């Protein structure tokens, strides 16, 4: 509720049981290609002065601890691989249930490969892993 109030949105009435995060663009506040273009578009021009500002940092403890179990997917050829692995470290630090599916270096496995190339064997493996993870969480 605190995060929703800071973002000036309503709390989602359907409780989230799990998240599948594929090649996440978690760090929108970095001084890089994503951080230079997205923050003002996503959060507005004065977001740094808002109550929502801390939540822009995906390693912010209150944000991380508010998340349901997460399945993270990346590959060594994903240009945002470092974002996913850093976020995974935050989930570990705060003892949040999660799983990391990190594929080895392969030129076909670029950013969001399982979405853009759904017929690759690794894409099938990703979708299967997400389905199994969600089913496991749902059974608990």
Language-model segments: what does each one mean?
Residues 1-140:
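Alpha/beta-hydrolase superfamily serine-hydrolase fold, recognizing
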């Amino acid at each position: 509720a605190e995060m929703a109030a800071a973002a000036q949105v309503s709390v989602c009435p359907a409780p989230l049981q799990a998240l599948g995060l594929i090649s996440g663009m978690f760090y929108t506040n970095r001084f890089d290609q994503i951080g230079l273009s997205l923050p003002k578009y996503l959060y507005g021009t004065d977001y740094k002065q808002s109550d929502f500002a801390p939540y822009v940092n995906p390693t912010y403890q209150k944000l991380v601890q508010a998340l349901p179990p997460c399945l993270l997917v990346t590959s060594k050829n994903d240009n945002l691989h470092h974002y996913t692995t850093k976020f995974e470290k935050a989930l570990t630090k705060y003892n949040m249930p999660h799983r990391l599916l990190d594929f080895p270096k392969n030129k076909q496995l670029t950013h969001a490969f399982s979405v853009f190339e759904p017929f690759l064997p690794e894409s099938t493996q990703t979708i299967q892993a997400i389905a199994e993870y969600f089913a496991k969480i749902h059974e608990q």
